[in-house]
Amino acid sequence: MKMENVVDAIQEMALQLRKINEIAYNQYKPIASDLCSRVASLSEVEYTLDRMLDFCGDDAVLGLFKDICRHYFDIYPEMIAYQINSYREIWDAE
């Protein structure tokens, strides 16, 4: 495979990843708004954050993740701490 083709393939993958992240943000934005407007069950918040973790490499989705964590930290501190640690294990560069 020529280098030019490799570069084109990588650019296409990057474009697709951006599109997927945009879709994830658009799907999770109303869910995050809803969760932050009330007190949801631990299982509902945990389920949502677990699924959002896959997309937290995107700053917009990460912002939603953080909003939910801030809203529920005093309500479900152990679960939120676990979710934050999971984020760090997956996405922190260090």
Segments the model singles out, each with a brief description of its role:
Residues 59-94:
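Amphipathic alpha-helical binding modules
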Residues 15-63:
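Amphipathic alpha-helical interaction modules
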Residues 7-16:
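Polar/charged low-complexity regulatory segments
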